[in-house]
């Protein structure tokens, strides 16, 4: 198949993407590019909740 892609280099400029998920490891070194843009908020009535599977990290990196 073709490996050439043609796209407007300004595509997506000025847009925002919001990811709402559990278990985002905001300190992951793969997110250095977005370190100032990641907002982590817990709405749990039970204090800090640890999501050991961290599926949000995978979602954010996609």
UniProtKB/Swiss-Prot annotation:
Induction record: By gluten.
EC number: 3.4.21.-
Control of this protein's activity: Inhibited by phenylmethanesulfonyl fluoride (PMSF) and chymostatin (CST), but not by Bowman-Birk type trypsin-chymotrypsin inhibitor (BBI).
Temperature-related properties: Optimum temperature is 40 degrees Celsius.
Classification via PROSITE patterns: SUBTILASE (PS51892), SUBTILASE_ASP (PS00136)
Any one GO MF annotation of this record: serine-type peptidase activity
The entry's keywords: Hydrolase, Protease, Secreted, Serine protease
Main location: secreted
UniProt record similarity statement: Belongs to the peptidase S8 family.
Alphabetical GO biological process terms: proteolysis
Protein localization: Secreted
Role of this protein: Serine protease. May be involved in the invasion of grains and hydrolysis of grain proteins.
Protein name: Alkaline proteinase
GO CC annotations on file: extracellular region
Keyword check for Nucleotide-binding: no
InterPro entries linked to this entry: Peptidase_S8_Asp-AS (IPR023827)
Top-level lineage group: Eukaryota
Peptidase S8 domain boundaries: 1-62
pH-dependent activity: Optimum pH is 8.3-9.6.
